[in-house]
Structure formats: structure tokens, C-alpha cells
Amino acid sequence: RTYLMGWGSILEMSSSVTQLTASGDVKDTWNRPLRDLRISVIDRCNYRCPYCMPDEVYGDGYEFLPRRHWLTPGEIKRVAGLFMQLGVTKLRVTGGEPLLRKDIVEIVSGLNELPGLDLALTTNGALLAGLAGELKAAGLKRITISLDSLDDAVFKQMSGEKGNIANVLEGVEAARIVGLSPIKLNVVVQKSKNDHTVLDLVDHFRGSGVIVRFIEYMDVGTLNGWRLDEVVTSKVLMEQIDERWSLKPVEPNYRGEVAQRYVFEDGQGEIGFISSVSEPFCGDCHRARLSADGTIYTCLFAKQGICVREQLRAGASDADLIGLLQNLWRHRTDRYSEQRGKETTKKVSKSRIEMYRMGG
């Protein structure tokens, strides 16, 4: 028997779980289906962004996961395939910084062999220029690149003095040349840190085909010193941008899309706003997360997860693993962003998992 600890109970599950069919959906306690999977392939990063991996915590002596604990490309592919049997159709490879894995092209190639999968990757772009062609050839369709400012001093501060804007822009151009599409740019906005550079960034990418998306600064993990008064809401940003370039809202591409989409009325492209703090979207969250060491989380703000690495390496059957995943999702109750600020949430906040471990 396998025992799942957490979520207020012990879920006892027999090893004789019946395997679901490829079309078998599973829903959580709030009737939310499982559609998206984020796979963090590495817990390391070449940046030290203060809102994710502050350098004073993750310095030179910090002990990350032993490499032997990382899931192999074959294990990653297997788990992704099992998730697809429960309804997953969209998969995003993340980190840490995923391009730091020497076998990242092999990982992408293996995932691309899974039929009917919408495959994307999120990166800080620092290493993308040299890998874009190989990733595209391996089957990568879409890419999202993090870039918090085009002001060199601001960018250096927000990357922990590790980033180089020129490298990121070279990565964006390389992605465009090889045909990765769409290319999205994620911008985390903090008050008095980079909010004054937002309009310049929009101006730079308007008309380029790159979709810029602004993300409200979130209280992911416990080490980034998050404060509500440092959040710049999507409403404020949208009004600032709309004052300079008229915007028009457009329908989401699919139910559960996290970004609110707008297009420029003059036809110069699209931007988006991700409002996890001011307008939580828990009710339509269909996403699970798999960490580099094989731990599965059901929320970005999770306090705990279930590790399947040992089961994978001990010869567990697909039926056993699917039953485990099914039970995990069926008992999912997460609605943290909607509960943010309540006393019960504040009491447990210090145990949340850090973002670099489960993928942003």
C-alpha cells in the first residue's frame, strides 16, 4: 500500500488501482479538472532575483538538490505521459533555470514524443541564443522569457547582479528567427523597483510580435520579504499603458488562461496582465506542478507535496502511479490566493515551498 501524507488526512490507496483510460478526466474538490502540468527540471538558477532566490539566502555555499535526485529525461517523460491520461494537454518546462540542464534538449525531445501535447518552456533567456535552434528542432513550440526591465541598472538589481540584458535580447531574437511562436515576455512588477520602466519596455516590444505580460508581485515561498504595499496592481498598470496607447480587451484563448489579454487598438500587438493578488483565479486553476526531484504540488503556494521519485525507481506500475495522481488531485482543496490575508492563511504561511523548487 501507498500512503499520501497531508491535506489534513492520510489517503490510503491500494496498489491494485485500476488504470484510467486516456480520456479519463479527474476533478478536485472544487470540480476543477486537471489540464496543465508545470515541470521544474532543475532547482538551480544563474540569477538571484530577490523575489525568488535572494542572494543572501542562496549564496555560493547553498546546498541544492544532489543531481542524482533529479528526475531523468525518461522519468520526466513517463510522469508527463501519466498526467496526460488524467486530462493534461498543456505542459510547460520550467526551473530554476531549465537551460542549465545539460540534457534539456533531450528532455524536450522526449516530451515532444507524447502525442497531442502543447509543449512550452519558460527561461530567463540568458542561455537561449545558443539553444533556441536545438530546442525548436527537438519539438518545442512556444517560449516565455523573463525580463523585468530594459533599464540596465534596474535589471541588474532585479536579477541579483547576475543578468545581462543584451544576452536576453539575443535570446528573444534567436527564438524569433527559429520560429518559436508565440514568444511571451514575463515582467514581475514591484513598486519603486521597476514600475517606472514599464512604459519603456512596452514601447520597445510594441509591433514586434512579442507578447509582454505583467505579473503582480506575489508572496510565493517565504524568503522574498513580500509586502502587499510593493504590489502594483494590473489595474494600475493597464490604466498607465492605456493612457499612452489605447487598449482593447480580448477573449481568453481558453478557459483558465491566467493572463487577461488586451490588444493595442492601432494593431501593434498584444499585452497581458496576470493578477494573482488583486484578482485571484483559483476557481479556474487546472494546474499541477512536478519538481526536479519528483515531488508533485497542486498549488504554486503549496506547503507540501508528494514525491514519486522512489516509486518510479522501485518499479511502480503505471496503474499504481496513475492511482496516486488521481487520488492526489481528487483531494485537492487549494485556493490560497482567494484566501490571502485571512488569519488562517497567515498562520501557515511560513511553511510554503519556495518557487524555484516547483517552477514559476
Please tell me what each predicted stretch does.
Residues 3-27, 279-360:
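Radical SAM enzyme core and accessory elements
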Residues 14-34, 256-270:
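Short, charged low-complexity linear segments at domain edges
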Residues 29-71:
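Canonical Radical SAM [4Fe-4S] cluster-binding loop centered on the CxxxCxxC motif
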Residues 47, 152-153, 280, 306:
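Glycine-centered loop/turn positions within well-structured domains
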Residues 48, 52, 153, 158, ...:
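Residues that scaffold the ATP/ADP-binding catalytic core of kinase and kinase-like folds
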Residues 59-63, 151-159, 221-225, 307-308:
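A short acidic, helix-capping loop that chelates divalent metal ions and anchors anionic groups
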Residues 70-93, 97-215:
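Radical SAM/AdoMet-radical enzyme domain recognition
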Residues 153, 162-169, 173-272, 276, ...:
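Radical SAM enzyme [4Fe-4S]-AdoMet core and its adjacent flexible, acidic
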